[in-house]
Amino acid sequence: MIDRYKHQQLRIGLVSPQQISAWATKIIPNGEIVGEVTKPYTFHYKTNKPEKDGLFCERIFGPIKSGICACGNYRVIGDEKEDPKFCEQCGVEFVDSRIRRYQMGYIKLTCPVTHVWYLKRLPSYIANLLDKPLKELEGLVYCDFSFARPITKKPTFLRLRGSFEYEIQSWKYSIPLFFTTQGFDIFRNREISTGAGAIREQLADLDLRIIIENSLVEWKQLGEEGPTGNEWEDRKIVRRKDFLVRRMELAKHFIRTNIEPEWMVLCLLPVLPPELRPIIQIEGGKLMSSDINELYRRVIYRNNTLTDLLTTSRSTPGELVMCQEKLVQEAVDTLLDNGIRGQPMRDGHNKVYKSFSDVIEGKEGRFRETLLGKRVDYSGRSVIVVGPSLSLHRCGLPREIAIELFQTFVIRGLIRQHLASNIGVAKSQIREKKPIVWEILQEVMQGHPVLLNRAPTLHRLGIQSFQPILVEGRTICLHPLVCKGFNADFDGDQMAVHVPLSLEAQAEARLLMFSHMNLLSPAIGDPISVPTQDMLIGLYVLTSGTRRGISANRYNPCNRKNYQNERIYETHYKYTKEPFFCNSYDAIGAYRQKRINLDSPLWLRWQLDQRVIASREVPIEVHYESFGNYHEIYAHYLIVRSVKKETFCIYIRTTVGHISFYREIEEAIQGFSQACSYDT
């Protein structure tokens, strides 16, 4: 059993037959070695107890009830007395029944069987390593080829003259005679290479380092040749080069992980613990069983039949043996991955069997449902909405979610401040939603970050930490700048919120996972906190006021909204006098008092460098005053000059939206400059 405190990661890969045997076999106190499942039975129909050496055997997988053997005897678990720790009659150990969740068994296959994941899935790892067409290998595995080229190094009978009684006849009539003789096994083991055993022998003879060297040499030669001018030949060269790259990467992976290629062919088939493939009794005495049990039974039936053909019957035709080996291969394929690149196997009710691959893969599989994405305490879920007023490292948490997530902390705070005498009184105060509850909740949230996660979590920025604040409503408020890391938008997306409990988790959330600590992409280093989607729309609306200058806006139809109560005809739009402001604070104050709109054009006094103004630009209008002063009005600015042509002041034509946008950028630059000065 894996200790979760000693192991920080889990790797799935190929293992050797010796490792499978070490996982599944155990030595009981009387010295007997158990672990091999030899019978396809589950429970006895009369006693309703597991069959010995069957798929639910208590000797192999442990007792069904803790401390009770198959005979019904009971022993206290962990008793230090000299009583035997197993039943001498049935051979069942007196251990905890939870052992049936992780104790494995194995099936000793009579013939080698290729692992269907490495043969039929694309790209085929076996075909890549052997550099042979997949169809040819499939025909060899499923015994569609009567014989293959001998791979033994010894001299073969097929190469010697006079080996056949009917030497005059052709090979077409001579070879089938060997498939019906009593010495077929000897002949086949020496002369014919077929089935998964042939694949295993070829994989065992591979030298991975030589494969890497030869593939690299061939890849360089193909690269030096250059284009041939024939499109078909050029495509073949490109495909061959891609294949060589995949082959080298695969060989390097096998070397790096200390995996032998022949392990892709199975000699021992692991049997899952019985608690992971249960049989449940429902109302009416009916039994519900996992499909994997039926698939295991099919494998054992066919494997035992093949064993009988090879051991008990000396005169079994060779074609029958090869056919039975093919059935064993197909049964194991169905167990591991039913219907892979073919018609799936169905039961009597025309229902597709759920294989091992179906159990572990997908959203409802073992990994994503119960290991990676299982439901946990101190977590919640809700729809996200935009929170533009939030800081980058903050998120808005609804009161309903926050009080549930931090309820234990609030209860502790109420008791510590002597506002509640016990847990029951504290819970009643929380249910009544007293004001003191929200005050304590805010105190708790100030020192406790939360984790936000949006599925699917494809990279590390899919889960980040934030400082929560209470908001009204039932939705989670999120700053729009962090959307790109989550790949989120505000069209109904949901996010999960988690509370880190341990000090290590809280420290990691604060130092590594805060959103303002993850401004760059960890993959390529580009900025990840960039305006996207709703923020871009907001910036567009904020700055879309004076794009066409004074000439186009003098009689702009957009000005009609300032005169909504007056009747305005399409041919004569009423002109709105544009107000003048001395500073940005007055302009924003007028907007807040609703005297002007967000995109209403206005004149703002500005300290503008004279060099920015083009000397050749001609004013659109010139307004003269009685004292001789005059205003030169350009497309986007206005200059007030004296009689002596001295510049008094300059006004720029802008909107409240532009002013707000400029102030935000200015504050951000100043804050960044201050932070840099502190660091230096």
Curated annotation (Swiss-Prot):
SUPFAM superfamilies: beta and beta-prime subunits of DNA dependent RNA-polymerase. Binds 1 Mg(2+) ion per subunit. GO terms for cellular component: chloroplast; DNA-directed RNA polymerase complex; mitochondrion. One of its GO terms (molecular function) is DNA-directed RNA polymerase activity. Its main location: plastid. The keyword Metal-binding applies. It catalyses: RNA(n) + a ribonucleoside 5'-triphosphate = RNA(n+1) + diphosphate. It comes from the Eukaryota. GO terms for biological process: DNA-templated transcription. It is an enzyme of class 2 (transferase). Its EC number is 2.7.7.6. Mg(2+) binds at D489, D491, D493. Zn(2+) binds at C69, C71, C87, C90. Keywords: Chloroplast, DNA-directed RNA polymerase, Magnesium, Metal-binding, Nucleotidyltransferase, Plastid, Transcription, Transferase, Zinc. Its cofactor is Mg(2+); Zn(2+). DNA-dependent RNA polymerase catalyzes the transcription of DNA into RNA using the four ribonucleoside triphosphates as substrates. Belongs to the RNA polymerase beta' chain family. RpoC1 subfamily. In plastids the minimal PEP RNA polymerase catalytic core is composed of four subunits: alpha, beta, beta', and beta''. When a (nuclear-encoded) sigma factor is associated with the core the holoenzyme is formed, which can initiate transcription. This is DNA-directed RNA polymerase subunit beta'. The gene is rpoC1.
